[in-house]
């Protein structure tokens, strides 16, 4: 029916060549895959089901493709695990599922609606790291020293069982309880997260150490005014709010970056074919526009050279964080960056 949310989504999908319905042969292959893990056919795997592994996502997440775990050793070192759903065990090369996933390339998300890259039997079922269910995973197991530096890592095929379906805003409330939070509210949250409650401060501790290291090498945290649409039960937008990033969002982002860093290092060490995402230095014209933005905000930034270093830009970001001029300055720096390219 014209004018409805469903009609609008259907029109957008059609215009962009995205199909909401899977071919019969793809659905047939998906439906034939058991919804319980069969360890007998899963090959040699490291059994991590006794480890305190759990997912952390937004409260509207429906599929869970990554989970984390952390242990602190007696010598002050950390054992960090990032566990990714092992989709490749079920989607074999050149199969109907593989060909359709390749054709789609990605899942397409609308507020309250998703067109998955794989049928829901996989994306929300056997390939989703659902709470309390055994799942096959590909795990990056990292050892970090007392300062948060990576000392060693390994990649293994594993079988895991997520203990808790974590939610960002709930974990943020546990890590940094807001003044409005009552003891009863926190008691309920502590009950839900009882199995992993002791891990959360340790995760926060490691994240803070990683943050210090990232700042030292000029890592840039750019704040933006990302919006979130609030939908009612009928799929209609009833509000637009600022999407806030709390400690847990930043923490998980850092842990995923660590796993990516290990993967890139493994690829380089083994001289494996790899796709690199490259950010080149800003050009002079964009720097002139940035300087104009900074002057308009009352800042007279003194860079040593026409093209500032990453450390100089990172210092400018930190200097304006939390200030009234944060958004224009951070947005100006973001726009001064070259678009990423793949090589």
What role is predicted for each listed range?
Residues 1-81, 88-134, 165, 172, ...:
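Charge-lined substrate channels and their catalytic hotspots, especially those that engage the 3′ end
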Residues 2-3, 62, 87-88, 116, ...:
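Short loop/turn segments at secondary-structure transitions that flank enzyme active sites
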Residues 49-50, 63-64, 73-78, 104, ...:
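Short, well-ordered loop/turn elements at secondary-structure boundaries
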Residues 108-216:
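Conserved catalytic alpha/beta cores of large enzymes that bind or transform nucleotide phosphates
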């Amino acid at each position: 029916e014209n004018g409805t949310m469903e009609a609008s989504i259907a029109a957008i999908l059609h215009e962009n060549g995205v199909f909401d319905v899977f071919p019969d042969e793809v659905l047939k292959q998906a439906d034939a895959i058991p919804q319980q893990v069969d360890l007998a056919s899963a090959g040699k795997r490291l059994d991590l089901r006794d480890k305190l592994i759990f997912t952390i996502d937004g409260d509207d997440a429906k599929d869970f493709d990554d989970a984390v775990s952390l242990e602190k050793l007696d010598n002050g070192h950390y054992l960090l695990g990032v566990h990714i759903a092992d989709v490749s065990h079920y989607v074999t090369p050149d199969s109907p599922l593989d060909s359709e996933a390749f054709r789609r390339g990605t899942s397409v998300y609308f507020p309250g609606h998703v067109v998955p890259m794989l049928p829901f039997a996989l994306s929300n079922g056997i390939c989703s790291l659902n709470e309390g269910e055994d799942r096959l995973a590909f795990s990056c197991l990292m050892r970090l020293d007392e300062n948060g530096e990576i000392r060693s890592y390994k990649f293994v095929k594993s079988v895991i069982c997520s203990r808790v379906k974590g939610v960002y805003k709930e974990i943020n409330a546990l890590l940094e309880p807001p003044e409005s939070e009552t003891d009863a509210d926190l008691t309920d949250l502590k009950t839900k997260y009882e199995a992993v409650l002791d891990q959360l401060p340790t995760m926060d501790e490691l994240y803070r150490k990683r943050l210090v290291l990232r700042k030292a090498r000029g890592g840039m945290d750019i704040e933006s005014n990302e919006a979130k649409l609030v939908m009612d039960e009928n799929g209609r937008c009833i509000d637009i709010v600022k999407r806030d990033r709390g400690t847990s969002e930043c923490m998980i982002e850092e842990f995923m970056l660590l796993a990516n860093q290990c993967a890139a290092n493994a690829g380089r060490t083994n001289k494996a074919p790899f796709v690199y995402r490259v950010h080149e230095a800003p050009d002079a014209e964009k720097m002139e526009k940035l300087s104009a933005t900074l002057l308009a905000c009352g800042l007279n930034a003194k860079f040593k050279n026409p093209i500032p270093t990453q450390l100089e830009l990172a210092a400018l970001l930190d200097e304006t964080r939390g200030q009234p001029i944060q958004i224009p300055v951070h947005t100006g720096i973001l726009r001064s960056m070259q678009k990423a390219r793949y090589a």
